[in-house]
Swiss-Prot record:
Alphabetical list of NCBIfam families matching this protein: PRK12904.1, secA
InterPro entries given in the database record: Helicase_ATP-bd, Helicase_C-like, P-loop_NTPase, SEC_C_motif, SecA, SecA_CS, SecA_DEAD, SecA_motor_DEAD
Stated name of the protein: Protein translocase subunit SecA
Quaternary structure, from the entry: Monomer and homodimer. Part of the essential Sec protein translocation apparatus which comprises SecA, SecYEG and auxiliary proteins SecDF-YajC and YidC.
Pfam families: P-loop_SecA (PF21090), SEC-C (PF02810), SecA_DEAD (PF07517), SecA_PP_bind (PF01043), SecA_SW (PF07516)
């Protein structure tokens, strides 16, 4: 009560922030007449003036009024568009490391030009982050004329671009790209083998469009760069044949209950578990198929990989549905983003799940992958010095933005008051009744010329509604992951009178639905349109626009509630832009996923008590409240999952930063010999300690073991036993010094052969390769640790603390292994004079030619002649990277002398 009273008197935090910023808006508005008087050249010259002021030590925030006034004036001259006062407010919010909640149609793209220009003045680079390539390209091309008018450069960062083009894009003042591409470039830069291969600069300022989609919906998705692991595709096929024999366990109170099934499904946690009966059956089937031996248990340690295959296959069949979770296109399983409904080309599920789905669908099974580098979006975006974002719906997630990213949310008021009518939900008993009611609503709306946008949560549902509309003879457009090529064009015309558009989730975000359709799209479709044609198109559009407003504006129909209120609000937000008329309504049934999992028992009981007849809908505050509670439950659960993921990833993140920092330092120096010398001392001390314990009696020394270890691991053949026999005065300390001195002497002789410069280059290469190899293995080990750590809870131990403790021990062990591997590799490398290598290669070539001639003489048929010709050709060439090294070491050329090339 007291808080409410204080808020009424002093205003909320949001009100106070906006009040403070409105004073700056008044200053910007006062500067407008002065800016209008400037010539184009004088306006352009302001950029150089601002940069000079920053160099002299002026604070960036002091430039806000004048810089924003310059951008507003430039926009008027270049685009003929003037930033509204609310857009200036939005620009200031974005500069203050906050999330700006701006409703759909309020001009977020134009708002972003203000903080982007201001922060680009520092010369450190601005990254504008969008959800897909189309929006990145569109926004970059749309805003390029404005930024170039003001003397700034603009780059676009797209997947598949060559490294020089990416480097150029990142070197620009303002770079547009997708969240995935920025993250992958960061990982690739930290796998580079020379400073020239890196493309990104230091991460300075990120301006994230649709920030809720990227920082919340995708927060659980780690970005992973992977390499191929061993092939086990045959096992996926064999296990896949067994799964259809298993029966799902139904709830005892359900109509389909037939006694105990073989596996149970937990839809909340997306897990599948075998029952006792299921375990017996699956073991029988595995024995029958010859996959497992008679009398063996599926849970025995020897069958742990088989258990992994069975679990993956069960999940693929029970939890993942075609045209909902994925689509099959051109013989490939492509994941569908659960939040946007878009396909995610190139993304794959982990833990063998993707291979299990491929086996289920009968398409080619691709190899499992091993992680080489990974990072979550949560940790990638926290690397920026300054982070801000904008979206139409952030307020429901304000707590998460604040607790995880330290970003406050500021709700920016609309330019014109919102007049959209949000009608109460209608709940039906069955899905068929709900679909029928939706069709009737669409018929009524289109009859009076009102456009309708139907939002579905999956491709399957969008096609179901589409089929029903086709049966009813209603023309419509379908917008889902299968047909997203024309996405922007379809969305742009979704406001046409009586147009019906079915969109999966939030497909088409970022494109405004203009009432009456888009006249710009009509003009763009014409070749060299005349002024008269353009005027006629505009006049026709105005008539259509007025007709749609008269009919009630755009009507939104939600075919079911999403598990997040925010995504429902995004769908509603497509209507009522810029103060336009509009309406929205959600249609639900007791068969919807959200209702079935989270709200079914209570609500269906309520509906039965009310004595509902088939086809009747319930519209009651209790039901709406029950649904809102169900959504809150899911949101809270998802937040906990994301928070927990972050807590675990933070452990890996500290290690990642340490490794990447060390790696970058290594890349930037040309001489690592001092580091190598220091490491050598540590490694030899630890190795000798294992056989000659410090300050121990000679009887405790294991000299034969030490000699063997030095020979095997460091290629040092030292007569230590002989030394000790001949020199009784040789004590522990001098022996240690002599072994180390011998290893240094042998190494220096190698250096004299190849030269210091070549040796420094080789040392750096070995350190980088060894670091990458061990980091890759460490990531896999961390992954295994993470998967089983929750079991420590049964031993009354905190899994998070145990994970921190064990991962730290593993990391320390990895760093010790790094030192050992580097010194071992450098010690064992064989070097020869270039003349010796050439002589050996000449001998090899002559031998190959001799064999080829013998082959030609002994076989005269075409095939063997072709083979001999090929052998002769092979003999002519230089040593291949994977051929045995001519020095006779038995190693591959690339791992021996090829390393010194």
């Amino acid at each position: 009560m007291l808080i409410k009273l204080l808020t009424k008197v002093f205003g909320s935090r949001n009100d106070r922030t906006l009040r403070r910023m409105r004073k700056v808006v008044n200053i910007i508005n006062a500067m407008e007449p002065e800016m209008e008087k400037l010539s184009d050249e004088e306006l352009k010259g302001k950029t150089a003036e601002f940069r000079a002021r920053l160099e002299k030590g002026e604070v960036l925030e002091n430039l806000i009024p004048e810089a924003f006034a310059v951008v507003r004036e430039a926009s008027k001259r270049v685009f003929g568009m003037r930033h509204f006062d609310v857009q200036l407010l939005g620009g200031m919010v974005l500069n203050e490391r906050c999330i700006a909640e701006m409703r759909t149609g309020e001009g977020k793209t134009l708002t972003a030009t203000l903080p982007a220009y201001l922060n680009a003045l520092t010369g450190k680079g601005v990254h504008v982050v969008t959800v897909n390539d189309y929006l990145a390209q569109r926004d970059a091309e749309n805003n390029r004329p404005l930024f170039e008018f003001l003397g700034l450069t603009v780059g676009i960062n797209l997947p598949g671009m060559p490294a020089p083009a990416k480097r150029e894009a990142y070197a620009a003042d303002i770079t547009y790209g997708t969240n995935n591409e920025y993250g992958f470039d960061y990982l690739r830069d930290n796998m580079a083998f020379s400073p020239e291969e890196r493309v990104q600069r230091k991460l300075h300022y990120a301006l994230v469009d649709e920030v809720d989609s990227i920082l919340i919906d995708e927060a659980r998705t780690p970005l992973i760069i992977s390499g191929p692991a061993e092939d086990s595709s045959e096992m996926y096929k064999r296990v896949n044949k067994i799964i259809p024999h298993l029966i799902r366990q139904e709830k005892e109170d359900s109509e389909t209950f037939q006694g105990e099934g073989h596996f149970s499904v937990d839809e909340k946690s997306r897990q599948v578990n075998l029952t006792e009966r299921g375990l017996v059956l699956i073991e029988e089937l595995l024995v029958k198929e010859g996959i497992m031996d008679e009398g063996e248990s599926l849970y025995s340690p020897a069958n742990i990989m088989l258990m992994h295959h069975v679990t993956a296959a069960l999940r693929a069949h029970a939890l993942f549905t075609r045209d909902v979770d994925y689509i099959v296109k051109d013989g490939e399983v492509i994941i569908v983003d659960e939040h946007t409904g878009r396909t995610m080309q190139g993304r794959r599920w982990s833990d063998g799940l993707h291979q299990a789905v491929e086996a289920k669908e009968g398409v080619q099974i691709q190899n499992e992958n091993q992680t080489l580098a990974s990072i979550t979006f949560q940790n990638y975006f926290r690397l920026y010095e300054k982070l801000a974002g904008m979206t139409g719906t952030a307020d429901t997630e304000a707590f998460e933005f604040s607790s995880i990213y330290k970003l406050d949310t500021v709700v920016v008021p609309t330019n014109r008051p919102m007049i959209r009518k949000d009608l109460p939900d209608l709940v039906y008993m069955t899905e068929a009744e709900k679909i029928q009611a939706i069709i009737e609503d669409i018929k009524e709306r289109t009859a009076k010329g009102q456009p309708v946008l139907v939002g579905t949560i999956s491709i399957e549902k969008s096609e179901l509604v589409s089929n029903e509309l086709t049966k009813a003879g209603i023309k419509h457009n379908v917008l889902n992951a299968k047909f997203h090529a024309n996405e922007a064009a379809i969305v742009a015309q979704a406001g046409y009178p009586a147009a019906v558009t079915i969109a999966t989730n939030m497909a088409g975000r970022g494109t405004d639905i203009v009432l009456g359709g888009s006249w710009q799209a009509e003009v763009a479709a014409l070749e060299n349109p005349t002024a008269e044609q353009i005027e006629k198109i505009k006049a026709d559009w105005q008539v259509r626009h007025d007709a749609v407003l008269e009919a009630g504006g755009l009507h939104i129909i939600g075919t079911e509630r999403h598990e997040s209120r925010r995504i429902d609000n995004q769908l509603r937000g497509r209507s009522g832009r810029q103060g336009d008329a509009g309406s929205s309504r959600f249609y639900l049934s007791m068969e919807d996923a959200l209702m079935r999992i989270f709200a079914s028992d209570r609500v269906s009981g309520m509906m039965r008590k009310l004595g509902m007849k088939p086809g009747e809908a319930i519209e009651h505050p209790w039901v709406t409240k029950a649904i809102a509670n169900a959504q809150r439950k899911v949101e809270s659960r998802n937040f906990d999952i994301r928070k927990q993921l972050l807590e675990y990833d933070d452990v890996a993140n500290d290690q990642r930063r340490a490794i990447y920092s060390q790696r970058n330092e290594l890349l930037d120096v040309s001489d690592v010999s001092e580091t190598i010398n220091s490491i050598r001392e540590d490694v030899f001390k630890a190795t000798i300690d294992a056989y000659i314990p410090p300050q121990s009696l000679e009887e405790m020394w294991d000299i034969p073991g030490l000699q063997e270890r030095l020979k095997n691991d460091f290629d040092l053949d030292l007569p230590i036993t002989e030394w000790l026999d001949k020199e009784p005065e040789l004590h522990e300390e001098t022996l240690r010094e002599r072994i180390l001195a011998q290893s240094i002497e042998v190494y220096q002789r190698k250096e004299e052969v190849v030269g210091a410069e070549m040796m420094r280059h080789f040392e750096k290469g070995v350190m980088l390769q060894t670091l990458d190899s061990l980091w890759k293995e460490h990531l896999a080990a961390m992954d295994y640790l993470r998967q089983g750590i929750h079991l420590r809870g049964y031993a009354q131990k905190d899994p998070k603390q145990e994970y921190k403790r064990e991962s730290f021990s593993m990391f320390a062990a990895m760093l010790e292994s790094l030192k050992y591997e580097v010194i071992s590799t450098l010690s064992k490398v064989q070097v020869r004079m270039p003349e010796e290598v050439e002589e050996l290669e000449q001998q090899r070539r002559m031998e190959a030619e001799r064999l080829a001639q013998m082959q030609q003489l002994s076989h005269q048929d075409d095939d063997s002649a072709a083979a001999a010709a090929l052998a002769a050709q092979t003999g002519e060439r230089k040593v291949g990277r994977n051929d045995p090294c001519p020095c006779g070491s038995g190693k591959k050329y690339k791992q021996c002398h090829g390393r010194l090339q």
